[in-house]
Amino acid sequence: MPYVFLLSPQLEIASQWDGYYEKTFEVSDHVHKEIILKVSGQTVLITGSGSGLGRLMAFEFGKLGARLVLWDINEQGNKETLKELEAMGVEAKAYTVDLSEYKEINRTADLVKSEVGKVDILVNNAGIVTGKKLLQCPDELMVKTVSVNTNALFFTTKNFLPGMLESNKGHIVTIASMAGKCGVAGLVDYCASKHGAVGFNDSLASELYALKKDVKTTVVCPIYINTGMFDGIATKWPTLLPILSPEYVVDCIMEAVLTDRAFLAIPKFSYIFIALAGLLPTEVLNLYGDHFGITHSMDHFKGRQSRQA
């Protein structure tokens, strides 16, 4: 397999990253004060806040003095997030929302605007995965995957962006995936939906630039995360392609959002794959997929298919 020699420099670089995945979000005192001033008193709406990354992000924003608006289809999980935030002394309000239904998104957004007011930071985090190959995936599940992972972004953003434009400040965060930058067997609907999420963010950022408005965007593309959504998946080289801890991913996301980064891939090694995907022929990329175990990473998928998280 001659193409594997192309991997040797990257393998050498990656071998120097021992302990990288234990990184925590730390900033200097000066920057920390600026961040607190930026977030304190701001209203942050997070979709998929009933578990996983959404819940952890809610805690982190709450620690910085933000007011939280929690959206999730999982009412019980969302109530648990709300309870923990209130125990921390954080002002928060929870709403049960099915993000696959745009009319429900619009209805709940109107309720938020009347009960809470303007949203300053919108975190489009909710997502679902079926983990089924195209011919085995029921039509209704494919439709729901695209509805939650892609279509919902249009309607959440359309509802809360006008307030940001009026005040000439705000931030829209899209939690996408490395599946939005490549294709993976067993994730046809998920990859398509996340490519849509990446395209949504890129086009939105372009529109905001054209308007000369100071509303920021951040798109986040992590690999597999150990939140339950991808239970059962495995890669051949976990040092290079680890199953990431949600705590680590949230640390990276918070740093990116609070420092206004436009694009974040997690882990850093992912940037190499993004570059290679744009340079190498499909035959070579397939060899990489085999070598790293990506091609068959979904073969033993179990997952958690009943929630938006």
Curated annotation (Swiss-Prot):
Family: Belongs to the short-chain dehydrogenases/reductases (SDR) family.
Pfam families (UniProt xref): adh_short (PF00106)
Known catalytic reactions: a primary alcohol + NAD(+) = an aldehyde + NADH + H(+); a secondary alcohol + NAD(+) = a ketone + NADH + H(+)
SUPFAM superfamilies referenced in this protein's UniProt entry, alphabetically: NAD(P)-binding Rossmann-fold domains
Residue positions of the active site: Y190 (proton acceptor)
Places the protein is found: Lipid droplet
Function: May play a role in lipid droplet formation. May modulate triglyceride levels.
Keyword Oxidoreductase: yes
PROSITE patterns listed in its UniProt record: ADH_SHORT
EC number: 1.1.1.1
Outcome of gene disruption: Viable, but intestinal cells contain lipid droplets that are reduced in size and that contained a reduced amount of triglycerides as compared to wild-type.
Organism of provenance: Caenorhabditis elegans
GO BP term, pick one: response to oxidative stress
A GO molecular-function annotation: oxidoreductase activity, acting on the CH-OH group of donors, NAD or NADP as acceptor
Protein name, UniProt field: Protein dhs-3
